[in-house]
Swiss-Prot record:
One of its GO terms (molecular function) is cysteine-type deubiquitinase activity. One of its GO terms (biological process) is proteolysis. Belongs to the peptidase C19 family. Residues 95-117 have a biased composition (Pro residues). Its EC number is 3.4.19.12. It comes from Homo sapiens (Human). Residues 1148-1159, 1215-1225, 1234-1243 have a biased composition (Basic and acidic residues). The lineage of its organism: Eukaryota, Metazoa, Chordata, Craniata, Vertebrata. This is Ubiquitin carboxyl-terminal hydrolase 31. Residues 128-765 form the USP domain. PROSITE patterns: USP_1 (PS00972), USP_2 (PS00973), USP_3 (PS50235).
Length: 1352
């Protein structure tokens, strides 16, 4: 049997580097020559395609990983040829075998000559591109992100999705469910593709086959069209969920529904939930709350989600660019930029133009004009969303019309006249304008004048050619004329506005153009024959069509013949409009990508919105339609959080992409502010929705809301077309890579956050496996590769070093150390004795993830235990346990395989209740207590633990006589963290070194399988007779059931045959050699007692004399008695431990445990019996004294069996004291204090009286325990029905004087608690003080017991 070594010092580390290199080279060449071997590691490695005859190809890039995996796999099994093959984590790593099978192979570290460091030339598993098969970039980017989802990739690549799936039969008549596509072929192809990426065996054929299967199952993905990556991601996850759900139904497995759900919460409808791995990993729930504005009642709806689609906060304004046409003799235009709100009316645009140009709003006319002339006119009531940034908007400044009081402001006219003076000189100023004349005349009119109503505003533009093919030229302008103006004057006014465009020598004699009125209906021209053309009905109709806002106006188009235009005008094609400074400012402000944070996106997502009037909701309380307010909020969170940024928007008929920069954290995304704050009562409501992700309790770990980024899907381009890439963080080397189809480039962390990010993949920090490079506890690249799941891919040889290391250092190891089976871990701890305990629990291991179903599932270290995915799948496979219950290792493995599944099932119960339930229910069927133990579910032991520590503090305060000695150890134990308290106390009991069993030791004769019944039946019989088991809760019952078994276990540990001194292995002990010496000394002093069953009240003069004889050996014996009796309590009466199941000639473990556990009134009682009857055992005593080092590794197999059969082995010593035993302990301490005080007053008669009074209250309990001993004789096996001659007589002594027995129990308990509450061995000085106090107590107990023994 190989010995478990610490990390870094295994047998492979001792081998020379040269031998390993040559061995790995030979192994690699042989594997290549045979084509990688059937099922060998080479079958899944990159070396298979290489040429077997080329020596240079053996050192190629693609073959490096295969050689490393082969070497590690073979080196780990040089010493264990018969190991079972690795099944990818689906089953336990322990090989099946009989009860006496050797311990599983050790977990050595990587070889001494590590692989060369990864560089750019060496391939990294998972870093491989995907071929683009025609616009499949959306598929490639999504697959790369899923491939780097650690737990999902492990689940697919290791084939764990096949658990429980029936083998496909070739029978054509087999029902196909959904047809050919109903057999999970999408999941199968996805698993093949992911496996090829991580084994570096990818070829374009893999992705081509996957696309073919996808197109076969989803018609929309046929062809080479572009698609949205988020839509494909949701489709793929949903399809994998359906495939897994279909396989579960085919296998006949019941849905993963908590069995106690309907029992605890009967209200509300109940429905079965088929939970799959996709749901457990990606799915969570959000809550939609609808609040009535009248009665404030709230209606909640809960819905699941796989992906959160977050809106991107948009800027509150958007830019619009308007060309302003100023009023004046010469048309002066300028382009300005204004910011308008996202929603509103055109009045906001008019106000913005007015603020920018200082023109009054009632003098601004907004129209739309393109190359062919006028189009729309805008009024104030028009929707602003109908005006887009690319529209050509013109704002005409019109002259101010007469106000009601008849005052006309000439601001615009004078301003533009000044501009005309500067620009065009005095020649133009000398021309008389009818408009200016009319304005001057109007200014002098009386307030009652109606002259203003006779004027009309004309918006004029020029257009070459007639009909629909014309094109606008020149600048538009404004005319303010009388309605009754004649045709000739109208023609002159138009030519006057265009005079500076005319050639200098041209003299116009006749009308060269025609006038067209832009009306609502049809095309209407003004004829020259009309005396007053502006009085035409079409003009009146155009004026009436103008909406509110601005000045009423008429749009005229002056249409010129092309030859006439070329003859009269010059430079008409150069229509230059300057831009104001505001245009540049608005472009910089709005066209640059807006920056926001991911937290702002969540705030916008959870923002309260008011329902529209059309969506009014009938309140069930008010019975009326109400415009309620709706709020979305996150109710639960998944382990893998997928966030989709809504970059694509549909605005009417236009679709656009938001290029906003969303800043997201790479690590430490805290989701606490975005999760619903729940009260105590709301955690359990409602009962009918989603039991797979129901929240429990208020004591959630804050780490559950912390997420780290591991992948980003990017979209480059616009809404019409673009390209997808993926940024992923590799779990082997922890580096970021950019996957652009088949091109892969390394990326720095600063380059991950870009404005092209589209889908974000976050992983819960507590769900990151320990083997991942993304974990905070992960080691170097080589060590993480050794523990990575890639090393356990199908096709590898018997469980490789990486498989063994990861499987034992992860969920199974952490599970067994944190909750169950601590005693059996001594055989295969995988180096945990030298490794911090927190690592194995805080981080998950292979195929394991944090159990978030129950936040109350916290172990004694205030951490939630890790449930192995392999353990869940093992139970889901519905196969019986393949281990016989005789071996502690196998029972531990089979029990652990079923713990995680049941813990996820019973989400409404504390994990401890489930663990106690399973640890007992999966014992051997012959154990009679297993059926009763199966019902032990109730309140979590956290409350029990609080009560225990409270009782311990009370007991410490009562113990005033030995407060100096007790306070040191008790205070030390209180200061220590939980990891050094309960676990080490348990290790002192059951953590026996089983790695050094010597075949020649006499202990080998004690066969564990010969006594399973007695050890299993004692807890049952004791529990049945316990009077305190009626009024207590079921967890306390389960705790008490474990105590008698632990008593027998402890006795077998502490009082084995003299040849096995039985050292106690403590992981935190500073000196191992010192513990061995002490244990051997204890063994020589303890195991020399000839009496198999020392009575509780045996206090002969010889034993009293031996107390007074001081010797170093007695001090060691006293320390041993105090140190090893770690988990016994006052309730462990001597009755169950008195009947020894072993023959007297072989081992006196249980019989002698009575003298150590029951009496303890005299430390010298063992010594006295040893001196009187040490002749038969003297050779063994000398052997034990001489062979200290050899005896340190020996053990009694029955002790392991006792710890295995005990349903509550891992319940710590503090948890083993219930209220009944605490009452007895208090009475014992009180009697002890009284005895000691009265002894100091040297009043022996009074001492006897007080002791009898103090012990009278517990006589019935001790007598009843004696009756239990009598009743339990019928349960003993035939080998155990050979009591010694003096056993019966000594039991009668117990019934005669119960008070003194309580005192002796008190002595043991006080000395025991002072040593074990600290969690670690005390210093030499502290140990001596503890020994002195135990000697004083024992002598005081003897002195007080003398008067009570005289009548006997």
């Amino acid at each position: 049997m190989s010995k478990v070594t610490a990390p870094g010092s295994g047998p492979p580390a001792a081998a020379s580097g040269k031998e390993k290199r040559s061995f790995s080279k030979r192994l690699f060449r042989s594997g290549r020559a045979g084509g990688g071997g059937a099922g060998g590691p080479g079958a899944s490695g990159p070396a298979a395609p290489s040429s077997p005859s080329s020596p240079s190809s053996a050192r190629s890039v693609g073959s490096f990983m295969s050689r490393v995996l082969k070497t590690l796999s073979t080196l780990s099994h040089l010493s264990s040829e018969g190991a079972a093959p690795d099944r990818g984590g689906l089953r336990s790593c322990f090989p099946p075998g009989p009860a006496a099978a050797p311990t599983p192979p050790p977990c050595p570290p990587p070889p001494a000559s590590p692989a060369p460091p990864a560089c750019a030339a060496e391939p990294v598993p998972g870093v491989a591109g995907l071929r683009n098969h025609g616009n499949t970039c959306f598929m490639n980017a999504t697959l790369q992100c899923l491939s780097n989802t650690e737990l999902f990739a492990e689940y697919l690549a290791l084939g764990q999705y096949r658990a429980g799936r029936p083998e496909p039969s070739p029978d054509p008549e087999q029902p196909a469910g959904r047809g050919a596509q109903g057999q999970g072929e999408v999941t199968e192809q996805l698993a093949h593709l992911v496996r090829a990426l991580w084994t570096l065996e990818y070829t374009p054929q893999h992705s081509r086959d996957f696309k073919t299967i996808v197109s076969k199952n989803a018609l929309q993905y046929r062809g080479n069209s572009q698609h949205d990556a988020q839509e494909f991601l949701l489709w793929l996850l949903d399809r994998v969920h359906e495939d897994l759900n279909h396989s579960v139904k085919q296998s006949g497995q019941p849905p993963l529904k908590p069995p106690s759900e309907t029992d605890m919460m009967p209200e509300g409808p109940s429905f079965p939930v088929c939970s799959t791995f996709v749901q457990e990993l990606f799915q969570a729930q959000y809550r939609s709350s609808l609040t009535c504005p009248h009665c404030q009642k709230q209606s909640n709806t809960f819905d699941p989600f796989l992906c959160i689609s977050l809106p991107i906060p948009l800027p509150h304004t958007r830019p619009l660019y308007v060309t302003v046409v100023y009023q004046g003799k010469c048309s002066h235009c300028m382009r300005i930029g204004v910011a308008v709100p996202l929603s509103g009316t055109v009045a906001r645009l008019r106000e913005a133009v007015s603020m920018e140009t200082k023109i009054p709003t009632d003098q601004i006319v907004l129209t739309e004009m393109y190359y062919d002339g006028f189009h729309r006119s805008f009024c104030d009531t028009d929707d602003l969303e109908t005006v887009h940034e690319s529209d050509c908007i013109f704002a005409f400044e019109t002259p101010e019309i007469f106000r009601p009081e008849g005052i006309l402001s000439q601001r615009g006219i004078h301003l533009n006249n000044n501009l005309n003076h500067l620009k065009f000189g005095l020649d133009y100023h000398r021309l008389s304008s009818p408009t200016q004349t009319a304005a001057k005349q109007g200014k002098m009119d009386s307030p009652t004048s109606r002259a203003g109503s006779d004027k009309i505003v004309l918006l004029v533009c020029n257009r070459a050619c007639t009909g629909q093919q014309g094109k606008r030229f020149g600048l538009p302008f404004v005319l303010h004329l009388e309605k009754t103006i004649a045709w000739d004057l109208l023609q002159k006014e138009i030519l006057e506005k265009m005079k500076y465009f005319l050639r200098p020598t041209v003299c116009i004699q006749v009308c060269p153009f025609s006038l067209r009125v832009v009306s609502v209906v049809g095309i209407t021209y003004l004829l020259p024959q009309e005396e007053q053309p502006l009085c035409h009905p079409i003009v009146e109709r155009a004026l009436k069509s103008c909406g509110p806002g601005g000045t009423a106006h008429v749009k005229l188009v002056v249409e010129w013949d092309k030859e006439t235009r070329d003859f009269l005008f010059v430079n008409t094609e150069d229509e230059y409009i300057p831009d104001a400074e505001s245009v540049r400012l608005q472009r910089e402000r709005h066209h640059q990508p807006q920056t926001c944070t991911l937290s702002q996106c969540f705030q916008l997502y959870t923002k309260e919105e008011r329902l529209a009037p059309d969506d009014a909701w009938r309140c069930p309380h008010c019975k009326q339609l109400q415009q309620g307010s709706i709020t979305l909020s996150l109710w639960t969170l998944p382990d893998v959080l997928i966030i989709h940024l809504k970059r694509f928007r549909q605005e009417g008929d236009r679709r656009m992409k938001l290029q906003n920069m969303v800043k997201f954290p790479l690590t430490g995304l805290d989701m606490t502010p975005h999760v619903v704050k729940r009260s105590q009562s709301s955690w359990s409501l409602p009962s009918h929705w989603s039991p797979w992700r129901r929240p429990y309790g208020l004591g959630r770990d804050p780490e559950d809301y912390i997420y780290d980024l591991y992948a980003v899907c990017n979209h480059h381009g616009t809404m019409q077309g673009g390209h997808y890439t993926a940024y992923c963080k590799n779990s082997v080397d922890g580096l970021w890579y950019c996957f652009d189809d088949s091109d892969v480039q390394q990326l720095s962390e600063d380059e991950v956050c870009t404005q092209t990010a589209y889908i974000l993949f976050y992983q819960r920090r507590t769900a990151i496996p320990s083997w991942s490079a993304n974990s905070s506890v992960a080691g170097s690249t080589s060590s993480s590769l050794c523990e990575h799941w890639v090393s356990r891919l199908p096709g590898s040889k018997p469980a490789s070093v990486t498989s063994a290391a990861s499987s034992r250092r992860t969920s199974l190891a952490s599970l067994s150390e944190s909750v169950e089976m601590t005693g059996e871990r001594s055989e295969d701890d995988g180096g945990f004795s030298t490794r911090p305990f927190v690592r194995s629990v805080q981080r998950q291991s292979l195929s394991s993830r944090s159990s978030v179903t129950s936040p109350l599932a916290v172990n004694e270290n205030c951490m939630r235990p890790s449930w192995s995915l392999s353990a869940k799948l093992q139970m889901r496979s519905n196969s019986p346990s393949r281990f016989s219950g005789d071996s502690p290792i196998h029972s531990s493995a089979s029990t652990l395989e079923k713990i995680g599944e049941a813990a996820d099932d019973k989400v409404s119960i504390s994990c401890f209740g489930s663990l106690r339930n399973l640890s007992s229910s999966y014992q051997e069927p012959s154990d009679s207590h297993s059926r009763r133990e199966h019902k032990a579910v109730g309140r979590a032991p956290l409350a029990v633990m609080e009560g225990v520590f409270k009782d311990e503090s009370d007991t410490r305060r009562l113990n005033s006589s030995v407060v100096d000695t007790q306070s040191k150890h008790s205070a030390q134990g209180d200061r220590l963290p939980p990891l050094s308290g309960p676990f080490d106390n348990n290790n002192q009991i059951a953590y026996v070194d089983q790695s050094d069993s010597v075949d020649s030791s006499p202990v080998k004769e004690v066969k564990a399988p010969s006594h399973p019944g007695s050890l299993a039946k004692k807890p049952e019989s004791t529990t049945k007779r316990s009077p305190s088991s009626k009024g207590t809760s079921e967890p306390e019952k389960s705790l008490r059931k474990g105590r008698p078994a632990l008593a027998s276990q402890e006795s077998s540990l502490s009082s084995t045959s003299p040849s096995s001194p039985l050292p106690v292995k403590v992981s935190l002990k500073p000196s191992r050699s010192r513990s061995k010496a002490d244990s051997s000394s204890r063994g020589s002093g303890r195991h020399s007692s000839p009496a198999p069953a020392q009575p509780k009240k045996e206090s002969s003069p010889k034993s009293q004399d031996s107390v007074s004889s001081p010797s170093p050996q007695k001090q060691k014996s006293a320390s041993a008695l105090t140190y090893t009796a770690s988990s016994t309590s006052a309730k462990k009466a001597s009755g169950p431990a008195t009947r020894s199941p072993f023959p007297p000639g072989k081992s006196r473990t249980s019989d002698h445990s009575l003298s150590r556990e029951g009496s303890r009134q005299s430390l010298g009682s063992d010594r006295a019996s040893a001196t009187s009857t040490s002749k038969p055992n003297s050779p063994r005593v000398s052997q034990a004294r001489a062979g200290e080092g050899r005896g340190a590794g020996k053990h009694v197999r029955s002790s392991s069996m006792a710890s295995l059969r005990s349903p509550s082995t891992s319940i710590k010593s503090g948890l083993k004291r219930d209220s009944k035993s605490e009452d007895k302990g208090l009475s014992f301490f009180k009697s002890a204090l009284r005895q000691k005080e009265t002894r100091r007053s040297t009043d022996l008669g009074k001492t006897a009286l007080l002791s009898k009074k103090a012990g009278g209250s517990s006589v019935k309990s001790v007598c009843k325990n004696t009756g239990d001993d009598e009743a339990e004789r019928g349960h003993q096996p035939p080998a155990s029905q050979q009591p010694n001659a003096n056993t019966t007589g000594k039991e009668q002594l117990v019934t005669k004087d119960p008070a003194s027995a309580k005192h002796s129990l008190l002595s043991a308990r006080k000395s025991k608690s002072s040593q074990l509450d600290s969690g670690v061995p005390s210093s030499p000085g502290g140990r001596q003080s503890a020994e002195k106090s135990s000697k004083k107590l024992s002598s005081s107990m003897q002195t007080s017991a003398r008067p009570s023994q005289k009548p006997q």
